[in-house]
A protein has these predicted regions:
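Non-catalytic, solvent-exposed segments at the cell envelope interface
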Residues: 2-10, 14-29, 37-366
Protein backbone atom coordinates (compact mmCIF):
# COMPACT_ATOMS: atom_id res chain seq x y z
CA UNK A 1 0.00 0.00 0.00
CA UNK A 2 2.85 2.33 0.85
CA UNK A 3 4.46 1.82 -2.54
CA UNK A 4 1.18 2.45 -4.34
CA UNK A 5 0.72 5.65 -2.41
CA UNK A 6 4.22 6.72 -3.25
CA UNK A 7 3.62 5.95 -6.93
CA UNK A 8 0.45 8.05 -7.01
CA UNK A 9 2.18 10.94 -5.33
CA UNK A 10 5.03 10.63 -7.82
CA UNK A 11 2.68 11.04 -10.83
CA UNK A 12 1.25 14.39 -9.71
CA UNK A 13 4.31 16.51 -10.50
CA UNK A 14 4.43 15.01 -14.00
CA UNK A 15 0.78 16.02 -14.63
CA UNK A 16 1.48 19.54 -13.39
CA UNK A 17 4.59 19.66 -15.51
CA UNK A 18 2.62 18.56 -18.57
CA UNK A 19 -0.10 21.17 -17.93
CA UNK A 20 2.56 23.83 -17.43
CA UNK A 21 4.19 22.79 -20.70
CA UNK A 22 0.88 23.25 -22.56
CA UNK A 23 0.45 26.68 -20.96
CA UNK A 24 3.98 27.77 -21.89
CA UNK A 25 3.45 26.65 -25.48
CA UNK A 26 0.09 28.45 -25.62
CA UNK A 27 1.66 31.60 -24.19
CA UNK A 28 4.51 31.37 -26.69
CA UNK A 29 2.03 31.03 -29.55
CA UNK A 30 0.09 34.09 -28.37
CA UNK A 31 3.31 36.08 -27.99
CA UNK A 32 4.34 34.97 -31.45
CA UNK A 33 1.08 36.27 -32.89
CA UNK A 34 1.47 39.58 -31.05
CA UNK A 35 5.08 40.03 -32.13
CA UNK A 36 4.20 39.00 -35.68
CA UNK A 37 1.35 41.50 -35.81
CA UNK A 38 3.58 44.27 -34.44
CA UNK A 39 6.31 43.50 -36.98
CA UNK A 40 3.69 43.45 -39.73
CA UNK A 41 2.36 46.81 -38.54
CA UNK A 42 5.86 48.32 -38.48
CA UNK A 43 6.55 46.90 -41.95
CA UNK A 44 3.35 48.41 -43.32
CA UNK A 45 3.84 51.88 -41.88
CA UNK A 46 7.60 52.12 -42.06
CA UNK A 47 7.32 53.97 -45.36
CA UNK A 48 4.90 56.58 -44.01
CA UNK A 49 7.12 57.76 -41.17
CA UNK A 50 9.17 60.91 -41.69
CA UNK A 51 11.63 62.00 -39.01
CA UNK A 52 11.16 65.70 -38.29
CA UNK A 53 13.17 66.95 -35.31
CA UNK A 54 11.30 68.32 -32.31
CA UNK A 55 13.47 70.70 -30.27
CA UNK A 56 12.83 72.77 -27.18
CA UNK A 57 12.97 76.56 -27.39
CA UNK A 58 16.31 76.76 -25.59
CA UNK A 59 17.98 74.47 -28.14
CA UNK A 60 16.26 76.30 -31.00
CA UNK A 61 17.65 79.64 -29.83
CA UNK A 62 21.22 78.29 -30.10
CA UNK A 63 20.82 76.63 -33.51
CA UNK A 64 22.96 77.79 -36.42
CA UNK A 65 20.33 78.77 -38.98
CA UNK A 66 22.73 80.32 -41.47
CA UNK A 67 22.79 77.27 -43.75
CA UNK A 68 19.05 77.14 -44.41
CA UNK A 69 18.10 74.71 -47.14
CA UNK A 70 15.28 72.25 -47.49
CA UNK A 71 14.62 68.58 -47.83
CA UNK A 72 11.78 66.19 -48.56
CA UNK A 73 10.72 62.81 -47.27
CA UNK A 74 12.43 61.07 -50.18
CA UNK A 75 12.65 60.74 -53.96
CA UNK A 76 10.55 63.19 -55.99
CA UNK A 77 11.23 61.81 -59.47
CA UNK A 78 8.21 59.51 -59.83
CA UNK A 79 5.33 61.41 -61.44
CA UNK A 80 1.75 61.25 -60.21
CA UNK A 81 0.76 59.35 -63.34
CA UNK A 82 3.29 56.66 -62.38
CA UNK A 83 1.92 56.36 -58.86
CA UNK A 84 4.26 58.86 -57.22
CA UNK A 85 3.29 61.22 -54.43
CA UNK A 86 4.50 64.65 -53.42
CA UNK A 87 6.81 64.18 -50.47
CA UNK A 88 6.74 66.12 -47.22
CA UNK A 89 8.59 69.44 -47.28
CA UNK A 90 10.84 69.95 -44.26
CA UNK A 91 13.32 72.80 -43.79
CA UNK A 92 16.08 71.95 -41.24
CA UNK A 93 16.09 75.62 -40.21
CA UNK A 94 12.53 75.18 -38.94
CA UNK A 95 12.23 72.12 -36.67
CA UNK A 96 9.02 71.58 -34.74
CA UNK A 97 9.30 73.49 -31.47
CA UNK A 98 8.48 71.30 -28.48
CA UNK A 99 5.27 72.30 -26.72
CA UNK A 100 4.06 70.62 -23.54
CA UNK A 101 0.71 68.86 -23.90
CA UNK A 102 -1.84 70.94 -22.01
CA UNK A 103 -4.10 68.05 -21.02
CA UNK A 104 -2.97 64.42 -21.12
CA UNK A 105 -6.51 63.39 -22.14
CA UNK A 106 -6.68 65.71 -25.16
CA UNK A 107 -4.40 65.26 -28.17
CA UNK A 108 -4.36 67.66 -31.11
CA UNK A 109 -3.07 66.42 -34.48
CA UNK A 110 -2.73 68.50 -37.64
CA UNK A 111 -4.02 66.87 -40.83
CA UNK A 112 -3.26 68.87 -43.94
CA UNK A 113 -3.45 68.60 -47.70
CA UNK A 114 -1.03 70.36 -50.02
CA UNK A 115 -1.79 72.29 -53.21
CA UNK A 116 1.01 70.64 -55.21
CA UNK A 117 1.04 70.51 -59.01
CA UNK A 118 3.41 67.56 -59.31
CA UNK A 119 5.72 65.37 -57.24
CA UNK A 120 8.55 67.93 -57.53
CA UNK A 121 6.32 70.80 -56.33
CA UNK A 122 6.93 70.02 -52.66
CA UNK A 123 7.56 73.62 -51.43
CA UNK A 124 3.95 74.51 -52.18
CA UNK A 125 1.10 75.94 -50.14
CA UNK A 126 -1.39 74.02 -48.07
CA UNK A 127 -4.84 73.53 -49.53
CA UNK A 128 -6.59 72.55 -46.30
CA UNK A 129 -5.66 72.38 -42.63
CA UNK A 130 -7.71 70.49 -40.06
CA UNK A 131 -7.02 69.81 -36.41
CA UNK A 132 -8.21 66.47 -35.05
CA UNK A 133 -8.79 67.10 -31.36
CA UNK A 134 -9.22 63.73 -29.64
CA UNK A 135 -10.58 63.73 -26.09
CA UNK A 136 -10.01 60.33 -24.46
CA UNK A 137 -11.76 61.32 -21.24
CA UNK A 138 -15.22 61.81 -22.77
CA UNK A 139 -14.60 59.90 -26.04
CA UNK A 140 -15.21 62.94 -28.23
CA UNK A 141 -13.67 64.09 -31.50
CA UNK A 142 -13.56 67.68 -32.73
CA UNK A 143 -12.64 68.35 -36.36
CA UNK A 144 -11.52 71.96 -36.67
CA UNK A 145 -10.88 73.67 -40.00
CA UNK A 146 -8.32 76.46 -40.03
CA UNK A 147 -9.17 78.86 -42.85
CA UNK A 148 -6.22 79.03 -45.21
CA UNK A 149 -6.74 82.75 -46.01
CA UNK A 150 -6.43 83.80 -42.36
CA UNK A 151 -3.87 86.61 -42.08
CA UNK A 152 -1.09 85.72 -39.63
CA UNK A 153 2.49 86.56 -38.79
CA UNK A 154 4.64 83.55 -39.69
CA UNK A 155 7.45 82.29 -37.47
CA UNK A 156 8.70 79.53 -35.19
CA UNK A 157 8.43 81.40 -31.88
CA UNK A 158 6.96 84.61 -30.46
CA UNK A 159 10.38 86.24 -30.90
CA UNK A 160 10.82 85.20 -34.54
CA UNK A 161 7.35 86.02 -35.91
CA UNK A 162 7.49 88.04 -39.12
CA UNK A 163 6.47 91.68 -39.27
CA UNK A 164 4.28 91.36 -42.38
CA UNK A 165 0.93 89.59 -42.57
CA UNK A 166 0.73 86.50 -44.78
CA UNK A 167 -1.95 83.93 -45.45
CA UNK A 168 -1.76 80.97 -43.08
CA UNK A 169 -1.47 78.53 -45.99
CA UNK A 170 1.85 80.11 -47.05
CA UNK A 171 3.65 79.06 -43.83
CA UNK A 172 4.33 75.61 -45.31
CA UNK A 173 5.74 77.21 -48.48
CA UNK A 174 8.13 79.46 -46.54
CA UNK A 175 9.37 77.06 -43.86
CA UNK A 176 7.97 73.58 -44.41
CA UNK A 177 5.98 71.51 -41.95
CA UNK A 178 7.95 72.80 -38.94
CA UNK A 179 7.25 76.48 -39.47
CA UNK A 180 3.61 75.77 -40.32
CA UNK A 181 2.99 73.88 -37.07
CA UNK A 182 4.99 76.40 -35.04
CA UNK A 183 3.03 79.32 -36.51
CA UNK A 184 -0.29 77.65 -35.66
CA UNK A 185 0.88 76.88 -32.12
CA UNK A 186 2.14 80.42 -31.51
CA UNK A 187 -0.83 82.24 -33.05
CA UNK A 188 -3.53 80.08 -31.44
CA UNK A 189 -1.63 78.92 -28.31
CA UNK A 190 -1.96 75.24 -29.22
CA UNK A 191 0.12 72.13 -28.46
CA UNK A 192 0.31 70.36 -31.84
CA UNK A 193 3.32 68.05 -32.24
CA UNK A 194 2.09 65.40 -34.68
CA UNK A 195 0.84 65.67 -38.24
CA UNK A 196 -0.46 63.72 -41.24
CA UNK A 197 0.09 65.02 -44.79
CA UNK A 198 -1.74 64.19 -48.04
CA UNK A 199 -1.45 65.39 -51.60
CA UNK A 200 -4.38 65.33 -54.06
CA UNK A 201 -3.46 61.89 -55.35
CA UNK A 202 -2.94 60.23 -51.98
CA UNK A 203 -6.28 61.43 -50.58
CA UNK A 204 -8.04 60.15 -53.71
CA UNK A 205 -6.20 56.83 -53.53
CA UNK A 206 -7.24 56.14 -49.94
CA UNK A 207 -10.88 56.93 -50.77
CA UNK A 208 -10.69 54.54 -53.73
CA UNK A 209 -9.21 51.83 -51.51
CA UNK A 210 -12.32 52.18 -49.34
CA UNK A 211 -14.61 51.79 -52.34
CA UNK A 212 -15.55 55.47 -52.51
CA UNK A 213 -17.65 57.53 -50.10
CA UNK A 214 -21.30 58.57 -50.14
CA UNK A 215 -21.81 62.32 -50.64
CA UNK A 216 -24.95 64.40 -51.18
CA UNK A 217 -23.95 66.58 -54.15
CA UNK A 218 -26.10 69.67 -54.67
CA UNK A 219 -27.24 70.20 -58.29
CA UNK A 220 -25.43 73.54 -58.49
CA UNK A 221 -22.16 71.85 -57.46
CA UNK A 222 -22.07 69.42 -60.39
CA UNK A 223 -20.46 71.67 -63.01
CA UNK A 224 -17.88 73.01 -60.54
CA UNK A 225 -16.99 69.48 -59.42
CA UNK A 226 -16.47 68.45 -63.04
CA UNK A 227 -14.26 71.50 -63.68
CA UNK A 228 -11.97 70.55 -60.78
CA UNK A 229 -12.06 66.94 -61.95
CA UNK A 230 -10.92 67.99 -65.42
CA UNK A 231 -8.00 69.86 -63.85
CA UNK A 232 -6.98 66.79 -61.83
CA UNK A 233 -7.10 64.58 -64.94
CA UNK A 234 -4.74 67.00 -66.69
CA UNK A 235 -2.34 66.90 -63.72
CA UNK A 236 -2.14 63.18 -62.94
CA UNK A 237 -3.77 61.41 -65.88
CA UNK A 238 -6.55 59.75 -63.86
CA UNK A 239 -9.62 58.49 -65.74
CA UNK A 240 -12.27 59.38 -63.19
CA UNK A 241 -15.50 60.24 -65.08
CA UNK A 242 -17.59 63.38 -64.70
CA UNK A 243 -20.74 63.09 -62.65
CA UNK A 244 -24.01 63.79 -64.44
CA UNK A 245 -26.41 64.86 -61.69
CA UNK A 246 -26.74 65.93 -58.10
CA UNK A 247 -28.10 63.91 -55.22
CA UNK A 248 -26.77 61.29 -52.82
CA UNK A 249 -24.22 59.14 -54.64
CA UNK A 250 -20.97 57.26 -54.13
CA UNK A 251 -18.03 59.33 -55.36
CA UNK A 252 -14.68 57.80 -56.23
CA UNK A 253 -11.49 59.30 -54.84
CA UNK A 254 -10.84 61.97 -57.48
CA UNK A 255 -14.51 62.94 -57.61
CA UNK A 256 -14.65 63.33 -53.82
CA UNK A 257 -11.46 65.42 -53.75
CA UNK A 258 -12.78 67.59 -56.60
CA UNK A 259 -16.05 68.10 -54.70
CA UNK A 260 -14.17 69.08 -51.53
CA UNK A 261 -12.09 71.65 -53.44
CA UNK A 262 -15.01 73.58 -54.99
CA UNK A 263 -14.50 77.22 -54.10
CA UNK A 264 -15.85 79.57 -56.77
CA UNK A 265 -19.47 78.44 -56.30
CA UNK A 266 -19.94 79.75 -52.78
CA UNK A 267 -17.15 80.51 -50.32
CA UNK A 268 -14.05 79.21 -48.61
CA UNK A 269 -16.23 78.44 -45.59
CA UNK A 270 -18.45 76.10 -47.61
CA UNK A 271 -15.29 74.59 -49.06
CA UNK A 272 -13.91 73.90 -45.58
CA UNK A 273 -17.24 72.32 -44.63
CA UNK A 274 -17.03 70.00 -47.65
CA UNK A 275 -13.51 68.99 -46.64
CA UNK A 276 -14.71 68.09 -43.14
CA UNK A 277 -17.60 66.12 -44.67
CA UNK A 278 -15.18 64.08 -46.79
CA UNK A 279 -12.91 63.44 -43.79
CA UNK A 280 -15.84 62.32 -41.63
CA UNK A 281 -17.33 60.12 -44.38
CA UNK A 282 -13.95 58.44 -44.87
CA UNK A 283 -13.46 57.75 -41.15
CA UNK A 284 -16.99 56.34 -40.92
CA UNK A 285 -16.39 54.09 -43.95
CA UNK A 286 -13.20 52.70 -42.40
CA UNK A 287 -14.85 52.23 -39.02
CA UNK A 288 -17.61 50.12 -40.62
CA UNK A 289 -15.09 47.74 -42.23
CA UNK A 290 -14.41 44.27 -40.89
CA UNK A 291 -11.13 43.58 -39.12
CA UNK A 292 -9.76 41.82 -42.19
CA UNK A 293 -10.77 44.69 -44.46
CA UNK A 294 -9.05 47.18 -42.17
CA UNK A 295 -5.83 45.15 -42.27
CA UNK A 296 -6.01 45.02 -46.06
CA UNK A 297 -6.56 48.79 -46.19
CA UNK A 298 -3.54 49.33 -43.94
CA UNK A 299 -1.44 47.19 -46.23
CA UNK A 300 -2.64 48.90 -49.42
CA UNK A 301 -2.32 52.45 -48.07
CA UNK A 302 1.30 52.11 -46.92
CA UNK A 303 3.30 55.04 -48.25
CA UNK A 304 0.25 56.94 -49.51
CA UNK A 305 0.46 59.57 -46.75
CA UNK A 306 3.33 60.90 -44.64
CA UNK A 307 3.46 61.50 -40.91
CA UNK A 308 5.85 61.93 -38.00
CA UNK A 309 3.86 59.38 -36.00
CA UNK A 310 5.42 55.96 -35.60
CA UNK A 311 3.43 52.75 -36.03
CA UNK A 312 2.41 52.63 -32.35
CA UNK A 313 1.21 56.25 -32.50
CA UNK A 314 -0.83 55.54 -35.63
CA UNK A 315 -2.50 52.51 -34.02
CA UNK A 316 -3.29 54.47 -30.84
CA UNK A 317 -4.68 57.50 -32.68
CA UNK A 318 -6.73 55.36 -35.07
CA UNK A 319 -8.33 53.41 -32.22
CA UNK A 320 -9.08 56.63 -30.31
CA UNK A 321 -10.63 58.25 -33.40
CA UNK A 322 -12.86 55.27 -34.14
CA UNK A 323 -14.02 55.20 -30.50
CA UNK A 324 -15.07 58.86 -30.79
CA UNK A 325 -16.85 58.82 -34.18
CA UNK A 326 -20.35 58.74 -32.65
CA UNK A 327 -19.51 61.77 -30.51
CA UNK A 328 -17.95 64.23 -32.93
CA UNK A 329 -18.25 67.92 -33.69
CA UNK A 330 -17.14 69.98 -36.66
CA UNK A 331 -16.10 73.62 -36.56
CA UNK A 332 -13.98 76.23 -38.27
CA UNK A 333 -11.84 79.17 -37.19
CA UNK A 334 -12.20 82.07 -37.48
CA UNK A 335 -15.92 82.02 -36.82
CA UNK A 336 -18.50 84.16 -38.60
CA UNK A 337 -18.51 87.73 -37.36
CA UNK A 338 -15.03 87.50 -35.80
CA UNK A 339 -12.95 88.79 -38.69
CA UNK A 340 -12.79 91.57 -41.26
CA UNK A 341 -11.72 91.33 -44.89
CA UNK A 342 -8.74 92.85 -46.66
CA UNK A 343 -9.34 92.84 -50.42
CA UNK A 344 -5.86 93.24 -51.93
CA UNK A 345 -4.60 90.66 -51.34
CA UNK A 346 -7.74 88.96 -50.06
CA UNK A 347 -7.18 87.93 -46.45
CA UNK A 348 -9.22 87.44 -43.30
CA UNK A 349 -8.03 89.82 -40.59
CA UNK A 350 -8.53 88.59 -37.04
CA UNK A 351 -8.08 89.78 -33.48
CA UNK A 352 -5.34 87.36 -32.39
CA UNK A 353 -6.13 87.48 -28.67
CA UNK A 354 -9.84 86.91 -29.30
CA UNK A 355 -9.29 83.97 -31.66
CA UNK A 356 -6.70 82.44 -29.35
CA UNK A 357 -9.23 82.49 -26.52
CA UNK A 358 -12.04 81.13 -28.70
CA UNK A 359 -10.12 78.13 -30.02
CA UNK A 360 -8.72 77.31 -26.57
CA UNK A 361 -12.20 77.44 -25.04
CA UNK A 362 -13.51 75.20 -27.82
CA UNK A 363 -10.81 72.53 -27.40
CA UNK A 364 -10.23 72.52 -23.65
CA UNK A 365 -13.42 74.13 -22.35
CA UNK A 366 -13.92 77.47 -20.69
Amino acid sequence: MGKKGQGTEGNKPRKKSKALSYFVRFLAAVMGLVIGFCLYWVYIFGGTFVSVPVVNQEDYSTMDLSEGGSTTGGDVTSSWSNGGHTRLYYDPSHPIIEVKQKDSNIENILVFGIDARGTDDYACRTDCMMILSINKKDNSLKIISLMRDTAVYIGDTEDTLGTRLNKLNSAYHYGGVGEMINTINVIFDLDIQRFVMFDFGSAAEIIDLCGGIEIDVRPEEVSYLNEDLEESRALDGNNSPNITSGGVQVLDGHQAVAWSRIRHLDSDFARASRQRTVATALMTKVNDMSYGQKLQLLNDSAGVFETNMNSADIMRVALNCFACLDNREEYRFPEDGTYTVQNDPWMMLIDFDEQKQRINDYIWGE
